């Protein structure tokens, strides 16, 4: 059993299941008609109900490399994609409960969280569901421009045919084309276990990287 911070998610390996299956333990309490309970003087409440959230493992990883060359100029692009799987965000749950996230601001501006054809207090809602991982589970599917490189090989005649020289620029993680999670699904909280892949616990955002290179040929 592997726990995910303050969220109630647990990674469990069960008969008939698969490696990487994650289960949530609580959901908002509902009445017999399926409506979320919001009792006067009590407000919202959670109840125990184990829910299969999905697997942290992707169904497929893909990469696509493109290269173009013309008169010493070379352009290379690498697109990468991860399809399937889930990620969880403790960071988002804490920000929502504190009322400092964009989503909490949006629903506050809209007059409250819509539940049962009515709107309820934003603070009450987000503080109630703060530890319920079922509300902080996202698709891990993402597609990005992983690398872009541009290089130019200078004509050897510039160096009396005694030297070859190529200069280039390279950028990595430049463009997130598709991602529904509130953080980069490829980041990981812990290097000690691959099962923490895609668990966001106050991580720094991913960054773009730029580089310059020079290659000589004698």
Model-derived features with residue positions:
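Membrane-embedded beta-strand positions in outer-membrane beta-barrel channels/transporters
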Residues: 63-65, 147-151, 211-213
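Conserved small-residue
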Residues: 1-56, 172, 176-182
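Repeated loop/turn-to-beta-strand initiation elements of outer-membrane beta-barrel proteins
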Residues: 72-76, 157-158
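Outer-membrane beta-barrel "beta-signal"
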Residues: 206-218
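Extracytoplasmic gating/loop element in the C-terminal half of outer-membrane beta-barrel translocons
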Residues: 18-21, 82-172
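Membrane-embedded beta-strand positions of outer-membrane beta-barrel proteins
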Residues: 77, 167-169, 214
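Flexible, surface-exposed loop regions and adjacent strand-edge segments
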Residues: 1-8, 92-101, 180-193
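Outer-membrane beta-barrel pore domains and translocons
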Residues: 69, 80-82, 170-174, 217
């Amino acid at each position: 059993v592997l726990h995910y911070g303050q969220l109630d998610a647990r990674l469990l390996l069960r008969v008939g299941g698969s490696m990487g299956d994650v289960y949530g333990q609580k959901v908002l309490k509902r009445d017999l008609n399926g409506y979320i309970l919001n009792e006067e003087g009590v407000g919202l409440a959670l109840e125990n109900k184990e829910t299969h959230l999905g697997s942290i493992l992707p169904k497929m990883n893909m990469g696509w490399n493109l290269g173009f060359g013309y008169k010493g100029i070379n352009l290379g692009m690498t697109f990468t994609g991860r399809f399937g799987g889930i990620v969880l965000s403790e960071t988002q749950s804490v920000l929502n409960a504190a009322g400092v996230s964009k989503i909490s601001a949006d629903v506050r501006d809209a007059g409250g969280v819509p539940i049962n054809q009515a709107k309820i207090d934003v603070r009450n809602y987000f503080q109630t569901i703060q530890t319920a991982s079922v509300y902080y589970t996202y698709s891990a599917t993402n597609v990005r421009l992983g690398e872009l490189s541009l290089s130019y090989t200078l004509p050897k005649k510039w160096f009396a045919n005694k030297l070859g020289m190529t200069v280039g620029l390279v950028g990595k993680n430049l463009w997130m084309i598709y991602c529904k999670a509130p953080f980069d699904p490829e980041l990981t909280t812990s290097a000690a276990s691959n099962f923490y892949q895609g668990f966001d616990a106050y991580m720094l955002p991913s960054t773009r990287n730029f580089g310059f290179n020079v290659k000589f040929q004698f």
